[in-house]
Amino acid sequence: MEERILTQNFTQEDASEYSLRPRWLSEYIGQQKIKEELKIYIEAAKMRKEPLDHVLLYGPPGLGKTTLATVISNEMGVGIKITSGPAIEKSGDLAAILTNLQENDILFIDEIHRLNRSVEEILYPAMEDFELDIVIGKGPSARSIRLSLPRFTLIGATTRAALMTSPLRDRFGVINRLDYYSVEELKEIIKRSANILNIGIDEKAALEIAKRSRGTPRIANRLLKRVRDFAQVRGNGYIDFKTSKEALDVLGVDEIGLEYIDRKILVSIIEKFGGGPVGIDAIAASIGEDGDTIEDVYEPYLLQIGFLNRTPRGRVVTKLAYDYLKYPYIEQGRIEGV
């Protein structure tokens, strides 16, 4: 049971992605404030010979929440078990994981906001008292026993912290929001990844990829690999500025990182809904995309760069986006310039 919940089948691409992940805080680029805080918490926990307090990491996908969890386990010198909220279907699944933890181990739960509520309730005494309540038997003969657990650290990760229940969220002693990365930070990540993958790349090319990576390391590394493919097939394998620009144009990633679906979302709101406000379900239906995917993957970046606003009545495309897409701006029924 535990093996099914805790392991995945890794592809060669997954293995390559894993090799790019930093192992120590000193190697981790970006999120400076979080790194400084964690360094203090980790040192203090090690001095007291105690597990690190429970940690909640939240923010858009691809910013390094899982990577940061593995870095914390390395810095603490403890083991880590990785699972996700949807994978823990029953309370027995969680009980099996918790009882197999070693002293001071880290349990990392990705998408923790998707935990089943009955499973979540088992976590409360486990997080607070390192004890597990188990019901044995059914009906009138059922009885509850309490098992002692090894002291552990729970690291939860979520892209949607607002969907977590207050009782669960309040049990985390350390709560950190991961922010989008600067272009300069992404450039350094790309250069580091290129070095690990033995890819030749110049400064301007790394900067060009960084500009189109939506502030997200996962996207930066993905684009680097695809540009590498382009350089090997169309060039001599070395990534210069010209090669990077041509490859990214072929991939449909524009100068600020917008992709086909981003433009489709914005154009749909402008052409079909007068620029908004419009609900996420209507947007999803109009472009044939899942609403959760729009909210989790595409919308955060459009909000970040000021192309989209969220209002109580729905999503609204901003003047900035109209100008970028070269559409006449419509405000309160009036076309600007007319």
Swiss-Prot record:
Reaction catalysed by this enzyme: ATP + H2O = ADP + phosphate + H(+)
Keyword Glycoprotein appears in the UniProt entry: no
Primary subcellular site in the record, as a coarse category: cytoplasm
GO aspect biological process, one term: DNA recombination
Positions bound to DNA: 310, 315
One Pfam family this sequence matches: RuvB_C
Keywords on record: ATP-binding, Cytoplasm, DNA damage, DNA recombination, DNA repair, DNA-binding, Hydrolase, Nucleotide-binding
Binding-site residues for ATP, renumbered to this chain: 20-21, 62, 65-67, 128-130, 171, 181, 218
Domain of life: Bacteria
NCBIfam families named in the record: PRK00080.1, ruvB
Family that this chain belongs to: Belongs to the RuvB family.
Name recorded for this polypeptide: Holliday junction branch migration complex subunit RuvB
Organism of derivation: Thermoanaerobacter pseudethanolicus (strain ATCC 33223 / 39E)
Encoding gene, per UniProt annotation: ruvB
